Design a protein with these regions (language model features):
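Active-site-proximal cap/lid insertion segments
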Residues: 3-8, 15-196
Length: 196
């Protein structure tokens, strides 16, 4: 994050694919190619960013498989703007309808610190973004297995903060935890950490 002096290459990384000035996709709504990112060549029209970043990571691992390596993969998912693949968005819209989990009165709790907090987790686009990221993680894990590196490579999966949960159009609910991104409550600072 930040100007060029803060980019990965300036911090000791040898290769940078897609790392740029912000935590979301470069130039706003760029989860699909053309990305318009000076650190990532455009792929075929409509190529999905999480899949592309996973494939770039596997290529890096293939190139460096004979020596110790560090691959640091930061998916822009599920950062705003919220844009999912059409097939996944439709899948989760149907699931929400099946569960009868449409937005209803009471979806937001009473105002807390002049904001209302989302209490219902039923955002189809957000769910689609999560699944696409999960598939991309699977691509990297499959690449490690194919290259015979899965038993000799530590993989860490983590996030940087809790989800946005306030009523300004953001999709997540961190309940039963209090708060979300930007709050010092557990909903803002508790995050996943998986080590394999």
């Amino acid at each position: 994050l930040g100007p060029e002096g803060f980019w990965p290459e300036s911090q000791g990384f040898d290769v940078n694919r897609g790392g740029i000035t912000r935590g979301g996709p470069y130039g706003g709504k760029k989860y699909f190619s053309p990305y318009g990112n000076p650190r990532l060549k455009d792929g075929p029209p409509g190529e999905h960013l999480p899949a592309r970043l996973a494939n770039e990571t596997v290529k890096f691992i293939e190139t460096n498989r004979e020596k110790p390596f560090l691959a640091y993969l930061s998916f822009y998912s599920v950062h705003t703007p919220l844009i999912a693949r059409k097939d996944l968005r439709q899948k989760y819209l149907a699931k929400r309808k099946q569960l009868d989990a449409a937005a209803v009165a009471g979806e937001f709790s009473k105002r807390e610190h002049r904001r209302r907090v989302r209490t219902l987790q039923a955002h189809a686009v957000y769910a689609g973004m999560i699944e696409a990221m999960d598939q991309a993680v699977g691509t990297v894990l499959s690449g490690l297995k194919r290259l015979g590196l899965e038993k000799n490579t530590a993989v860490f999966f983590m996030s940087d903060n809790g989800g946005l949960s306030t009523s300004e159009g953001h999709p997540t609910s961190n309940l039963p935890l209090r708060g979300g991104k930007g709050w010092m409550y557990e909903g803002g600072i508790r995050e996943p950490l998986i080590v394999r």
